[in-house]
């Protein structure tokens, strides 16, 4: 599964139909979203604005595919990396491009500032951009031979001991064969895009974001010699 992020160079592609997903806690009264939407419409494009935070409860609101236009080509997120990650997860089945406007703290993914957005929109409308594909992971929770939860993620899948103070034991299998036994607080399975997130904090390597691999990194392992392991994107890990 691929996530598509935009880099402003050159690509032969026509872009007119947009959806803006904004975090109202970081974009007060949707002021940035409305400004960008007005600019897109002024330039001849179409745009809808959606909010992914329930202002009454402060909880994240899932964006449904039915809420976005059928001819959608580009999703613009306003917030931080989390806003973009949520949008990519919600709309991962759609063949669209994602671009992030940073109103958060880190901005690894949402790296365009609000001040740069009009120039970026001009590049989109005039076919001066490049598209970079990003792989995603599919995770399942299986209980009694039944899949009880399934989700696709852009950054990482984390298996953690939770509130238990004792160290946990993890038997990791790859394609049905035992890879190793780990004593640790948890296991991170990261994409190259997620390699700069929790994986990096846990001592894992940084990978090129457009590469294709899975990075397995133990969290606080009880062994000096335990290190991250690089796996194929096609491997099935249990």
Regions flagged by a language model, labelled:
Residues 177-184, 188-225:
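Gly/Ser/Thr-rich active-site loops/lids in small-molecule metabolic enzymes
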Residues 29, 82-87, 196-201:
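Short glycine/serine/threonine-rich phosphate/pyrophosphate-binding segments
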Residues 106-185:
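Catalytic core of DAGKc-family lipid kinases
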Residues 15-74, 78, 86, 115-130, ...:
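ATP/NTP phosphate-donor binding region
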Residues 220-223, 227-238:
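A structural-propensity feature for long, helix-poor, extended segments
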Residues 46, 95-97:
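Proline-centered loop/turn at the N-terminus of a beta-strand
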């Amino acid at each position: 599964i691929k996530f598509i992020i935009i880099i402003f160079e050159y690509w032969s592609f026509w872009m007119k139909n947009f959806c803006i997903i904004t975090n109202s806690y970081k974009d007060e009264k949707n002021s940035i979203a409305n400004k960008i939407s007005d600019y897109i419409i002024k330039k001849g494009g179409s745009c809808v604005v959606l909010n992914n935070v329930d202002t009454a409860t402060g909880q994240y609101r899932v964006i449904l595919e039915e809420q976005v236009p059928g001819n959608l080509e580009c999703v613009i997120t306003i917030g931080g990396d989390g806003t973009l990650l949520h949008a990519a997860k919600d709309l991962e089945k759609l063949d669209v491009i994602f671009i992030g406007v940073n109103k958060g703290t880190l901005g690894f993914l949402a790296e365009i500032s609000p001040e740069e957005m009009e120039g970026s929109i001009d590049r989109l409308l005039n076919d001066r951009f490049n598209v970079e594909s990003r792989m995603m992971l599919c995770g399942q929770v299986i209980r009694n031979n039944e899949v009880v939860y399934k989700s696709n993620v852009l950054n990482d899948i984390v298996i953690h001991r939770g509130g238990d103070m004792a160290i946990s034991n993890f038997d990791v299998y790859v394609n049905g064969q035992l890879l190793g036994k780990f004593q640790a607080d948890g296991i991170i399975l990261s994409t190259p895009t997620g390699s700069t997130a929790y994986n990096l904090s846990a001592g894992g390597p940084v990978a090129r974001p457009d590469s294709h691999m899975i990075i397995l990194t133990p969290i606080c392992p009880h062994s000096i010699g335990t290190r991250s392991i690089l796996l194929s994107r096609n491997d099935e890990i249990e």
